[in-house]
Amino acid sequence: MAVRIEMPSVGLSFTPDSKESIPIAIVTGGEYDGERLYLNDDSKGGKKPKKKLSFAKAKIDKMRSRDRADLEMKLQEAFHKGVAPEHLLIEGDGVRELYEEMLEEVKKDTSVELPPESQFQLIPSPKKDVREIWYIAGPSGSGKSYIAKGLAERYRRMFPDRPVYLVSKLKEDETLDAMKGGPPRRLDVQKLVDNPLKDLDLLADSMIILDDYDTFTKPFDKAVQKLIDDIATMGRHSNTTMLCLSHYLSNYAKTRLLLCEATHFVLYPAATGNHALNYLLQTYLGFDKDETAAIRKIKSRWVCIHKNFPQWVVSEHSANLLHHE
């Protein structure tokens, strides 16, 4: 009888395993071009049996049920604590090898690496009744508009009857105006000042892009901030997906509500100061120091983090699950 180890209830795969599987990115370039990366969710139970790790060591196979149960519990505890195999304090022939096998199996389900010629492109949720808030933060020229353009084009492809709106200080935007299917519909900021949008149903079932919203000055800044706050708090009822592009990872009091409600964060670690990155990841995403350091070490221009359970991180060439238990 094999030792049974409880595995993560979610995993990453290029093949959906149920109707609940959600595509979170698509591959462009190379032999995997066009492949979708899915988040396969078994957290509701019953979709597939828990994985079972077999190990040939006779002393483990022949353990008494009580001893085997004790070993399972200890290995599971070590797994949850993130104990490395070389630091495992559980004694017994073959125990460390079993633990290493367990970690290797987990890694297969929770991380994906792409070859250099391929890269991930982010995509919005295909579910009609899901609203998302994407906070895309980085300095000028980092590629914020390019990310927003890709998301908006995918949104249009998924929902051809839904409009995409743009609020921008610029009269022309070379990147966003070049969207496939034509430029987004511009909302007149002066009208937002004169007649604040009182009914969010006017933006129901739509996507709205707020380009460098933090650059607006009086009297437009308050009108734009009110629009953002209203969508953040009430947009879930109208299925309004919002992309907020900003130069700042956090503007403290001004962004507190938005960051609390955001579902996705797109960051540019190499172009971001340590203090700002640490503050955002640890305050709003619950990262510890080691996880924060790991984000900075990712070799990618951008990194996208899904805030809610299960947390995942996607960059240009890799994807990883975090806090998936």
Which residues fall in each region the model found?
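C-terminal helix/juxtamembrane-tail motif
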Residues: Q311-E325
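Active-site regions of enzymes building and remodeling cell-envelope glycoconjugates
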Residues: T175-V193, A319-L321
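Conserved ATP-driven motor cores of ASCE-family P-loop NTPases powering translocation/secretion/packaging/pilus
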Residues: A2-S13, K180, Y248-Q311
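Conserved P-loop NTPase motor cores
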Residues: E132-R154, K169-K171, R185-F287
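Conserved RecA-like ASCE P-loop NTPase motor core of nucleic-acid helicases/translocases
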Residues: P163-K169
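N-terminal pre-Walker A segment at the start of P-loop NTPase domains
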Residues: R4-L122
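Post-Walker A helix-loop "phosphate-sensing" segment adjacent to the P-loop in P-loop NTPases
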Residues: E153-P163
